[in-house]
Amino acid sequence: MPGARVASGDRVTLRTVEAEDVPFLQRAGANPEIRYPLGNPLRNREQYEISDERTAPDGFLVCLEGEGTPELLGDDFEDHDLRRIGQVSVADAHYKRPELGYWLVPEVHGEGYGTESVALAVDYVFRQYDTPAVGAGAFDHNDASRRLLESLGFVEEGRRRKFMFVDGAYRDMVQYGLLREEWVEAVDSER
């Protein structure tokens, strides 16, 4: 049974993460095409379950739903009108500026699903929390992620040099921010 729908866009839906989603998250997290750009360590299913209980960010599964997705479905999905393609999370929203994290399975990179998913998450943050801004980080070598943030109006705010050892090299973390008024203005200009 899929988790509750939190937000829907033109093509993607954000849903709550449920226990049945942990195998998908663990398999995706083990994929080097996802793990290395994010700088994440390998974790087993139990570590995913424990981690989610402790950190409890607003984590959402990114899904494609409805007609047109059957060729993309895996054998482990009960609902054949739903395809899990990634995750968007919001951390630290209760006590400081919220930080977004996101990833999609490599098969859907370049299709615009990431931009739509992150936009839905930004909208969620500004509707749910009384915060003046939202932040996100991307490693300096992750050009696609940096372009995604900039396309939504995020502004580079700083660089944490040699922040983490990722994929055989020390990588800088580029920090981005988006003010509430910038988001509201961008949304209003699209109407």
Spans of model-derived segments:
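Short, solvent-exposed alpha-helical surface patches in well-structured domains
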Residues: 24-27, 36, 116, 120, ...
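Conserved GNAT acetyl-CoA-binding A-motif
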Residues: 128-137
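Conserved catalytic-core motifs of GNAT/GCN5-like acyltransferases
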Residues: 137, 155-171, 188
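Glycine-rich beta-to-alpha transition loops that act as phosphate-gripper elements at the mouths
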Residues: 65, 138-141
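Conserved hydrophobic/aromatic "anchor" residues
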Residues: 12, 17, 124-126, 154
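Conserved beta-strand edge residues that scaffold enzyme active sites
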Residues: 43, 91, 139-140, 163
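GNAT-family acyltransferases
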Residues: 1-110, 170-191
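Conserved acetyl-CoA-binding loop-helix of GNAT-fold acetyltransferases
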Residues: 103-104, 110-127, 143-151
